[in-house]
Design a protein with these regions (language model features):
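Conserved short beta-strand elements that form part of the metal-binding/catalytic scaffold
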Residues: 1-19, 64, 70-78
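Vicinal oxygen chelate
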Residues: 13-105
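Histidine-centered active-site/metal-ligand motif
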Residues: 2-3, 22-23, 55
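A cross-family glycoside hydrolase active-site/sugar-binding cleft signature
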Residues: 8, 27, 52
């Protein structure tokens, strides 16, 4: 894994000392097919999808729970070494490129 807890520099609009949580991420097995299956299932249940993301180290499916908390299902790219993943994550400051669900392989 490239990280267990990621501390990322906040954007300028962040209010210092405010209480909050950006999101909680849950790592999954099953690859991009599992992300597509979860996406379809969440939509079928009426869950609000935020976005699908290519993080360069893996793919994420962001959505909101009934209380408005932002959650993520995350699949890490296979065969990515810890060092490679940390380098990508560090150099790009947690890369996040929004993609369409159809772009998943």
């Amino acid at each position: 894994r490239h990280h267990d807890i990621a501390l990322i520099k906040a954007r300028a609009k962040h209010v210092p000392w405010s209480v909050g949580l950006h999101h909680v991420s849950m790592q999954i097995e099953g690859g991009t097919e599992e992300i597509k299956r979860l996406h379809s299932r969440l939509i079928g249940k009426g869950v609000e999808i935020d976005r699908v993301v290519d993080h360069s180290v893996g793919w994420g499916l962001y959505f909101y729970d009934p209380d408005g908390n932002r959650l993520e299902f995350f699949y890490e790219r296979p065969n990515l070494s810890l060092e490679e993943g940390q380098k990508i994550f560090r150099e790009a400051e947690a890369p996040s490129r929004s993609i369409d669900i159809s772009e998943l392989g």
